[in-house]
């Protein structure tokens, strides 16, 4: 599991037993494989815009769809917008959506961040990976802060310089923050993570 995947999994400190996780971006599948393995009672939905990435699913040993895993070919921003009127809100929204030009255009829009906030419940966690080469990382963090409010926690990842940004209602709950601090070392050891 690569460094930024480990950092993105820090959502477990704020939402240790998510019922539903929505992932925008499949990539090489490290996030979905980790969640599928370590969170067996969690329903995972992954939305990937590039059919060629989905076609490599078997090559990257990403498990097949089943009752708790579904990979959908589509635009993540549109999928999130469609969830606004749904009862199937995710507890956690993990965003790692890039194309050859950087962050996917529809994901970079302020409307996506606003819709993301609307689909997360009172216990929700929003996590976004911003690649090191993304020139507008500061702009993205400020957009997230404007929509979600403080705290927004940007964490620089290892030598590559990626930034993982955490936001959402769960981060404002003082009891959750205290519990997160107490549970961090236990979760790190159990899942071989580095928070």
Functional labels for PLM-detected ranges:
Residues 32, 141, 184:
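Generic structural marker for isolated residues within well-ordered, non-membrane alpha-helices
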Residues 41-43, 66-68, 123, 149-151, ...:
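A generic structural signal for alpha->beta connector loops
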Residues 104, 110-174:
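C-terminal substrate-binding/active-site "lid" region of AdoMet-derived donor-dependent transferases
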């Amino acid at each position: 599991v690569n460094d930024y995947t480990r950092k993105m999994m820090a959502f477990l400190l704020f939402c240790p037993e998510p019922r539903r996780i929505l992932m925008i971006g499949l990539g090489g599948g490290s996030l979905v494989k980790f969640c599928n393995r370590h969170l067996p009672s969690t329903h995972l939905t992954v939305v990937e815009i590039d059919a060629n990435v989905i076609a490599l699913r078997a090559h990257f040993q990403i498990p097949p769809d089943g009752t708790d895993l579904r990979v959908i070919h589509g635009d993540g921003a549109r999928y999130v917008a469609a969830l606004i009127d749904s009862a199937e809100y995710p507890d956690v929204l993990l965003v790692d959506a890039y194309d050859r030009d950087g962050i996917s255009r529809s994901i970079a829009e302020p409307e996506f961040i606003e819709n993301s906030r609307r689909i997360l419940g009172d216990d929700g966690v929003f996590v976004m990976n911003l690649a090191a080469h993304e020139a507008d990382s500061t702009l993205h963090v400020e957009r997230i802060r404007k929509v979600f409010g403080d705290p927004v926690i940007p964490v620089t990842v290892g030598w590559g310089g990626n930034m993982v940004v955490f936001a959402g209602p769960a981060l404002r709950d003082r009891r959750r923050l205290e519990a997160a601090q107490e549970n961090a070392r236990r979760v790190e050891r159990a899942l071989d993570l580095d928070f």
